[in-house]
């Protein structure tokens, strides 16, 4: 595949990444707030709590007439409790490191324009 305008391709990729993180941040809010509420009161209707969080943070409506333990589809709750927000923390940390590399190694270049290919200074900085 030949890219006709590499700059437009880079800009589109950057926008897609930004949108993906915005959507993911809302999903992380659902998981974090659901788990917090679940541990505060494990006797409550957890499906209601789940859909309350989904509606509030993702803007999705619960299916009419559905009353199944949809929260159970997220196995993270059992296998790695109170962990899901770490995915977002990792994204935030990676973004901060990248911005710092752009500032320190690439003399203040905009982070969207920086790549690490053939740049040993990045390794030295790290």
Model-derived regions: residue spans:
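C-terminal, non-catalytic "cap/extension" segments appended to globular domains
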Residues: 3-12, 20-126
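Active-site region of the double-stranded beta-helix
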Residues: 16
